[in-house]
């Protein structure tokens, strides 16, 4: 009986190899042959999963985005009794990729962003990842506003636009801090301070007692 191949698992394994190589030499330097060698599979196995290098890179971008999003959701689910404010703090911690164990992932993500700026095909999965995170931020900000006292800024968030604006601002800040830490302009601790200060301002505008966004 022929051996059954788990193509989902193989595609993820190949995506991990793509990420390692993209970290070492940038996405533009990744070849299907090198990926096969790094993933310890044949070139034919890679080609059966992905018809072209572009298709392989697209999947790798989606893979990284899904990994970050899943980690954010898992962090939130780990504390079901936590407030929306606490959950948002945990979410921003994960998205910023400031911890040392996420440094390689941060480099890979920014390498794909840089490549997407000159190669439109990679832009769509990146936009999808950012959209999913923005939607999550909108939901948590709206829930946090609802938990605050009635009237004032909190009421404005019930209509949606302000929550979207705040979510966009927070996502842009969180994402931008990743690059500042990678190039050494800020330390991870300094970046966390910037993020916590912004969240404190958000809680003040909402009239919500928010915790510091620490993991």
Regions found by a protein language model. Name each.
Residues 50, 111-118:
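Short helix-capping/turn signature of helix-turn-helix
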Residues 101-110, 120-147, 165, 193:
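Amphipathic alpha-helical packing segments from all-alpha helical-bundle domains
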Residues 73-106, 153-160, 166-170:
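Hydrophobic alpha-helical connector segments
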Residues 123-127, 144-215:
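Hydrophobic/aromatic-rich alpha-helical bundle segments in the mid-to-C-terminal region
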Residues 3-4:
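Short Lys/Arg-rich basic patches
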């Amino acid at each position: 009986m022929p051996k059954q191949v788990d193509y989902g698992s193989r595609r993820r394994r190949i995506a991990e190899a793509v990420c390692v190589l993209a970290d070492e030499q940038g996405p533009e330097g990744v070849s299907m042959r090198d990926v096969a060698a790094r993933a310890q599979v044949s070139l034919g196995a890679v080609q059966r999963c992905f018809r072209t290098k572009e298709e392989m890179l697209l999947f790798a971008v989606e893979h990284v985005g899904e990994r970050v999003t899943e980690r954010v959701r898992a962090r939130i689910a780990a504390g079901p009794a936590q407030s929306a404010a606490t959950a948002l703090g945990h979410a921003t911690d994960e998205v910023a990729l400031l911890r040392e164990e996420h440094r390689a992932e941060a480099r890979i993500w920014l390498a794909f962003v840089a490549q997407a700026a000159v190669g439109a095909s990679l832009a769509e999965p990146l936009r999808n990842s950012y959209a999913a995170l923005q939607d999550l931020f909108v939901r948590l900000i709206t829930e946090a506003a609802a938990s605050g006292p009635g009237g004032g800024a909190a009421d404005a968030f019930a209509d949606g636009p302000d929550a979207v604006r705040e979510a966009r601002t927070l996502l842009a800040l969180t994402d931008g801090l990743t690059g500042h830490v990678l190039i050494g302009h800020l330390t991870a601790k300094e970046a966390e301070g910037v993020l916590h200060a912004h969240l404190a301002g958000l809680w003040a505008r909402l009239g919500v007692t928010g915790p510091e966004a620490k993991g």
